[in-house]
């Protein structure tokens, strides 16, 4: 199977809107190449891990790369993307650019290696590519070895980072956890590293499930995590202390009631993948169902919301 890489150069003001448009049109992952990164702005957050190649970045603005299954990428989809992006009021059409290229699946692993290096994703979690060696900086540092494959979820997106921080704060070793839309399995691995022993990872995409299983093996937790294909929480009969979902807002809307019903009393629903503009709608829906909102965090235009199931 081949993949269509869509490369779009835009101004910073519309970055989050364009990313959301691509994800809502079911892209299989997004890469951000920000011209500001060449100024060293990431150094304070992630440390001096590697040097950036200026040739990989636009002269100005942001290059957003999205990946679609070649079979699914049609002229109709292209026109819809162009129409939605060009309708953005703040779009600077002087720098706007839209390009496409086919990437063979056999080349995908090497393509990702150009972007993926060790970095600190949260207070205690560091993400380490499976093809690189890394020396822990302290005993408290928890390293997740990862090969994103085609499932993405490398931890460098603000939503994943916020979920990792929420997991550190709200997940206990004694908890049972279900990770909905597990992708590369990063959030399930994080729970395992914190001592959780009852974890279920679910994804609708069979490829994502395969990649997640491979990453569980890399982190020696394949026997501790139940992995399965499934459509959100539909058909789930077990109860859990924590439901985690880092997926798009309109999908989260569909599963809020199921998340509430799947949780034990005082269980926690950790959810992200929500642009700030849609966060109030999600929060109100969660409250109507019966959740007590215990945490709301924002990062770069995205929100992470944690709700607790109120005892009846």
UniProtKB/Swiss-Prot annotation:
Q: What is its EC number?
A: 2.1.1.-
List UniProt keywords, sorted A-Z.
Cytoplasm, Methyltransferase, S-adenosyl-L-methionine, Transferase
InterPro entries given for it? Answer: Ribosomal_L11_MeTrfase_PrmA (IPR050078), Ribosomal_PrmA_MeTrfase (IPR004498), SAM-dependent_MTases_sf (IPR029063)
Listed under GO biological process in this entry are: methylation
Gene Ontology CC: cytoplasm
Where does it live in the cell?
Cytoplasm
Q: What is its main location?
A: cytoplasm
Q: Which Pfam families does the entry mention?
A: PrmA
The entry's S-adenosyl-L-methionine-binding residues are 160, 181, 203, 246
Q: What class of enzyme is it?
A: transferase
What Gene Ontology terms describe what this protein does at the molecular function level?
Answer: protein-lysine N-methyltransferase activity
Q: Which reaction does it catalyse?
A: L-lysyl-[protein] + 3 S-adenosyl-L-methionine = N(6),N(6),N(6)-trimethyl-L-lysyl-[protein] + 3 S-adenosyl-L-homocysteine + 3 H(+)
Q: What does this protein's UniProt record list under function? A: Methylates ribosomal protein L11.
**PANTHER family per the UniProt record, alphabetical:** ELECTRON TRANSFER FLAVOPROTEIN BETA SUBUNIT LYSINE METHYLTRANSFERASE (PTHR43648:SF1)
Which family is this sequence assigned to? Belongs to the methyltransferase superfamily. PrmA family.
What is the official name of this protein in its record? Ribosomal protein L11 methyltransferase
